[in-house]
A protein has these predicted regions:
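Phosphate-binding chemistry for phosphorylated carbohydrates and sugar-nucleotides
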Residues: 1-160, 166, 172, 178
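Catalytic-core signal marking the mid-to-C-terminal active-site face
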Residues: 160-246
Length: 246
């Protein structure tokens, strides 16, 4: 229907290679292929296709936050958007600022698509998602669906808009995410870690924000720092890392 020429990659499963060097968690693969084939858009899904990351024609990776911003604009124009948009604690602060400017209500849920869904239902919103690419289009489904999101983007591109123009909606605040492998995720509840987190937050002050949390899927502690001062983010994350890696 859309008349696109498609290059398929990572579509030969053998039961062991799910998400191996491909998909939404390995975006540099799609980036290299977009440049190689000089295509208009790269679409990268995870193994069960509930998560999506895109790559524009210039080779720039487009995360879930930018996709959500684009979808909110599209649905708002079409008078489809209900209530506002649900993001998470990981959503870039630039997205929040953008929605404030657009007078679009934006609320944050805990990290995880189940919490996004719960908040959407509670607030009667029909759009929500995560920076990682879990995006729920409440008009069509009650769970993340990367294929539906891809179709929404492709339909928007039918009018001749380039992906780079369509999907770079807002200027994100510099953000650094570090994942630390640990034996016990409860380490962040220990006194030395709590002290380090307090120290880092004091150093960050009003110049940005820090988020330290246990991974819900891996034996890792995730530390996210966000600020216009990149060196400050690095310093704050280092303080917390040193208390975890000993």
């Amino acid at each position: 229907t859309l008349g696109a020429k498609i290059y398929n990659v990572g579509t030969s499963p053998n039961g062991l290679n799910i998400n191996k060097n491909c998909g939404s968690t390995f975006p540099k693969k799609i980036k290299s292929l977009v440049k190689k084939h000089k295509v208009d858009l790269g679409i990268s899904l995870d193994g069960d296709a509930d998560r999506i990351i895109l790559c524009d024609e210039k080779g720039k990776i487009i995360d879930g936050d930018q996709i959500i911003a684009m979808l909110a604009n599209r649905w708002k124009r079409k008078k489809i958007l209900k209530g506002g948009v649900i993001g998470t604690l990981m959503s870039n602060y630039g997205l929040q600022n953008y929605f404030r400017e657009q007078k679009t209500k934006f609320l944050r849920a805990n990290v995880g698509d189940r919490y996004v869904k719960e908040s959407m239902q509670k607030n009667r919103f029909n759009l929500g998602g995560e920076q990682s690419g879990h995006i729920i289009l409440g008009k069509f489904a009650t769970t993340g669906d990367g294929l539906l999101v891809a179709l929404e983007v492709l339909f928007s591109m039918r009018k001749g808009k380039k992906a780079s123009d369509l999907l770079n909606v807002f200027k994100p605040m510099p953000q650094i995410l570090e994942n630390i492998l640990v034996r016990d995720k409860n380490i962040i509840n220990e006194l030395r870690c709590k002290k380090a987190i307090r120290k880092a937050n004091k150093l960050m002050g009003r110049n940005g924000r820090l988020l330290v949390r246990k991974s819900g899927t891996e034996p890792k502690i995730r530390i996210m720092g966000e600020s216009h001062n990149k060196n400050l983010i690095i310093k704050c994350i280092k303080i917390i890392k040193q208390s975890i890696k000993y």
